């Protein structure tokens, strides 16, 4: 996970705890969770739309009837 080990993650969490305090952590985690959920939802919608476009059969273009034949 981004090249971070367990000790680094614990250190980062302790710094966050010191910066925001214990009362703000649940609110921050809730906001982060909602943000990740929205991001994944948008990502899924984009992937579905892309797959739908890719899976469509190619459209035939109308041939030009005024063109000259050699």
Curated annotation (Swiss-Prot):
Record keywords, A-Z: Cell inner membrane, Cell membrane, Membrane, Protein transport, Translocation, Transmembrane, Transmembrane helix, Transport
Annotated membrane topology: Single-pass membrane protein
BP term (GO), one: protein transport by the Tat complex
UniProt-recorded Gene Ontology molecular function terms: protein transmembrane transporter activity
Gene3D superfamilies to which the protein is assigned, alphabetical: 1.20.5.3310
Classification via InterPro entries: TatA/B/E, TatA/E
Gene Ontology terms: cellular component: TAT protein transport complex
Pfam families in the record: TatA_B_E
Main location: membrane
Ranges that cross the membrane: 1-21
Keyword Transmembrane helix: yes
This protein's record includes keyword Zinc: no
Compositionally biased region (Basic and acidic residues): 50-62
Record's function text: Part of the twin-arginine translocation (Tat) system that transports large folded proteins containing a characteristic twin-arginine motif in their signal peptide across membranes. TatA could form the protein-conducting channel of the Tat system.
Protein name: Sec-independent protein translocase protein TatA
């Amino acid at each position: 996970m981004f090249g971070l080990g367990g000790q680094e993650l614990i250190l980062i969490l302790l710094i966050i705890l010191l910066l925001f305090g214990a009362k703000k952590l649940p609110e921050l985690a809730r906001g982060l969770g909602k943000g990740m959920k929205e991001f994944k939802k948008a990502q899924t919608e984009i992937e579905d739309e892309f797959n739908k476009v890719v899976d469509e059969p190619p459209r035939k273009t109308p041939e030009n009837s005024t063109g000259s034949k050699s």
